[in-house]
Amino acid sequence: MSFTAAFAQSPVDSKTTRLHQRILTLDTHADAPTMLQKEGFDVGITHDTKRDNSQIDFPRMKQGGMDAMFFAVYLPQGQRTPEGHAEAKRNALNQFRLIHEALKKYPDAAELATSPADAYRIEKAGKRAIFIGIENGYPIGEDLSMVKAYYDLGCRYVTLSHFANNAICDSSTDPDGPLHNGLSAFGRQVVAEMNRLGIMIDISHTSDKTFYDVLALTKTPVIASHSNCRALCDFPRNMTDDMIRAVAKNGGVIQVNFVSDYLRKPSEEYRQALTKMRMANVGRVSSPEQAARQQARTDSVKQVYRNERASLADIVNHIDHIVKIAGIDHVGIGSDFDGGGGVNGLEDVSEIANLTAALKSRGYSDKAITKIWGGNLLRVMSKQQPAK
């Protein structure tokens, strides 16, 4: 792995740099497809976060030493109707197309990965390993066959819900409260089908009842692709200590995200403003263009309240808490870059070595950091049982 001068100038000592170069770094939640949908955006060239809000591209992944990322095919929750599901499916398939086209355009920079072995092989070749996940089971609609269709396109995890309830399960943040009291009957079929295919079940964003329903049903370890600790930041989107223990008992992993308002509790004024923006399109069919405008409005709210932004230390605090509750084998990284992630000291993917340095400063061993940066997630992925 090679690093550019910009990486060398970051506040990371030579010993930590060598460690960062040696280990496989993996981020389970990157909303890069949101940027791919913007006209003229090219993931193969270097962008400036301050100029276009992009936090991920292939050159900056290489610059920062990010070996592997799950690009999240994200669908905002719309109407639970045939028309809404059809639009979500169209949107999802378009994002898969954009990811595959980007990989085809830059074969020397990045390659699709669908297994742990792929990640190690691609990293050894000096390229970026790009996995695919789906954030929000909404594009599955009520058609179980779509689970296999997305698997065939490279999907290796599905976040069952997002900010509102869908046909699969209840969300942790739907303002109308629960719809199914956890998993729906259809959601139980989806969990079984994901187990059959070897798709990781992602319980980030789901309600507490959904979470426990999934753990009672799944035959394989689960992931929380981008979730934090409720004990440190009291919000329904985060996980309680009992939930963290339950994930450990299941053999799964919790991937800490970099979203400020899930790391450190913001003011109630900011929370309400952000929730209002996030819920604005729930129940509506959103095109990629409409979703981009909604994201721009959300970004404007965050700019107004920018002084409440979290720091790199806050990320490590959540990692510390999970290790204390569940042990070193059940924590990882899911940044949510390009989807709200980013803190003071860690603005984009080019700066991820700063997290390695922060972990070293907190006393984590090289072995522990290797687990946090990808080893734990790849262990969970290897435990899935794909259909023969």
Predicted regions and their residues:
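Bacterial Sec-dependent N-terminal signal peptides
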Residues: 1-11
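Extended hydrophobic secondary-structure segments
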Residues: 34-35, 194-214, 329-335, 339-341
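Charged catalytic cores and adjacent phosphate/nucleic-acid-binding surfaces used
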Residues: 220, 229-230
